[in-house]
A protein has these predicted regions:
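Acidic/His- and Gly-rich active-site-bordering loop/insert found
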Residues: 21-131, 140, 150-159, 338
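Metal-dependent amide/peptide-bond hydrolase catalytic core
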Residues: 21, 59, 199-455, 462-467
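Sec/Tat signal peptide C-region and signal peptidase I cleavage site
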Residues: 16-20
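Short, solvent-exposed loop/turn and secondary-structure capping segments
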Residues: 49, 96-97, 109-113, 173-178, ...
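Solvent-exposed, acidic/flexible segments
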Residues: 23-31, 42-53, 79, 133-136, ...
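Acidic/histidine-rich catalytic neighborhood of metal-dependent amide-processing enzymes
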Residues: 127-128, 134-213
Length: 467
């Protein structure tokens, strides 16, 4: 239904190749920023976020930002994992600032595995290829590009606009800049709200844009260690009381346990709005669960979709396994890592208690692993955020709904919410049914998505900054 509203013209536009001859001068410069970021290696193993931050800071300074408006940060133990905070002052003494957040680091990419060099921005058949083209250097480039343009155009926002480019989002092994800023430089990034990755649109197999999503909250990651112990003995005289068997039974209990269905304003709005755009049985179930979360038939239907199943509850899954100490000995110890994605509002303690009750074996020890996550609350479904997102979308994506979403994954937003900065994943960019290859091989994004999303976000930030 939504696709028919768009019409053939938009469908054709989605697959248009943006050659250099077709680009406006401002788009050409944006492409240069995008290229510089993608071609600056920011992997943990061999790259440098500090270098990327310095390059972006140099562009801002060349545009007219004063040294006092640029703050570089890093810590001695992680010199290559630094970041940048930039500030464009607003004219209002009462309007609180807004924060643009972006992580510079990317997931590892091996040249031998890729069709093209992952650290060269390559445009081919209407798509940009390279590590970070989607996650999330396209947004980083957009933030830098718009601040450069605002400065050069002498645009004076009502709100102060802050930008934080950080490192460490893609791995727990790195220095996380967003976490460090929230704990050590809270005043520097103080804002009424933040805009981040996590939203975006989806096109169908014909290239017709179906929806744009705005992320309003996300799950919280919490790891648990499950362990069993036993005196062990010689494997020639086995007994049923075996640490590995005991652990296996506990893991099956975790597999078979479903946390209770939980909904909030965001997920209720998602299922109602996204379901209304479908004509199949799944769409009917989506609308039904939004109206009545106790509808067991609707829940059963939704549970057949792994993404919807996860959106409706806390989930826990075994991800790592170890056990035994010798091939000819009964195991003295066996263990597993349990990766939980807690629904906003849930606590580590409640999640642990639910798992222990499901396992039902006091001989299985469950321990929460650091970092211990506190209770995460979703960002409010605020009309001051949703309204401008929908209004600007009507200009760039006519007939396409903007749907509130809750991510089942996690981003650096998890560090901002606890310090009072609600964070929203922006709409704008989109991918097709095959996805963008983020974290995988041959990561890519369509040129049409890149340039249209960039224009959309520039107008959206102006709408927020002028309010």
């Amino acid at each position: 239904m939504i696709g028919r509203m768009l019409g053939a013209a938009l469908a054709l536009g989605l697959v248009h190749t943006a050659s250099a001859a077709d680009l406006r001068p401002d788009q050409i410069r944006f492409r240069e920023i995008y290229k510089e970021l993608v071609e600056t290696n920011t992997t943990l193993s061999s790259g440098s976020c500090t270098e990327a931050a310095a390059k972006m800071g140099a562009r801002l300074k060349a545009a007219g930002f004063a040294d006092s408006q640029l703050t570089y940060f890093s810590v001695p133990d992680h010199p290559k994992e630094g970041g940048l905070v930039a500030i464009l002052p607003g004219t209002s003494k009462t309007a609180k600032p807004m924060l643009l957040l972006g992580h510079l680091d990317v997931v590892e990419a091996k040249r031998a595995d890729w069709t093209r060099d992952p650290f060269v921005l390559i445009e081919e058949n209407g798509y940009f290829y390279g590590r970070g083209t989607a996650d999330m250097k396209v947004i980083d480039a957009t933030w830098i590009d718009m601040l450069v343009r605002f400065k050069e155009e002498k645009y004076q926002p009502k709100r102060t606009i802050k930008l934080a480019l950080t490192c460490g989002e893609e791995t727990l092994a790195a220095f996380n800049g967003a976490d460090w800023l929230a704990r050590n430089k809270r005043d520097l990034i103080d804002a009424e709200f933040a805009l981040n990755e996590g939203g975006g649109g989806r096109a169908d197999a014909n290239g017709v844009l179906q929806s744009q999503g705005i992320q309003v909250g996300e799950k919280v990651v919490q790891q648990f260690r499950m362990e069993t112990t036993n005196p062990g003995g010689h494997s020639s005289v086995p007994i049923r009381d075996n640490a590995i068997y005991q652990l296996a039974q506990a893991l099956l209990k975790v597999r078979d346990y479903d946390f209770p269905l939980t909904m909030n304003d965001t997920t209720r709005a998602f299922f109602a709005k996204a379901g209304a755009g479908r004509t199949d049985q799944m769409g009917q179930a989506m609308v039904a669960i939004a109206k009545d979360p106790t509808d067991k038939a609707a829940e059963a239907q939704l549970n057949t979709d792994r993404a919807f199943h996860s959106m409706l509850r806390t989930t826990c899954v075994a991800t790592l396994l170890d056990g035994g100490h010798a091939e000819n000995a009964l195991p003295q110890r066996a263990g597993a890592n349990i990766n939980c994605r807690m629904f906003p509002g849930s606590t580590m303690e409640a999640t642990k208690a639910a798992l222990e009750a499901a396992i039902g074996d006091p001989g299985v020890k469950l321990t929460a692993l650091p970092p211990i996550r506190g209770k995460s609350m979703p960002s409010p479904l605020d009309p001051k955020i949703m309204g401008p997102a929908e209004k600007v979308a009507a200009k760039y994506f006519p007939g396409v709904p903007v749907i509130p979403t809750m991510s089942t994954g996690a981003s650096d937003a998890l560090y901002l919410a606890p310090v009072g900065i609600p964070t929203y994943g922006v709409p704008g960019f989109w991918s097709g049914p095959e996805g963008s290859g983020a974290h995988g091989l041959n990561e890519h994004m369509s040129a049409k998505s890149v340039f249209t999303g960039r224009d959309y976000l520039t107008d959206l930030v102006k709408a927020y900054a002028g309010a």
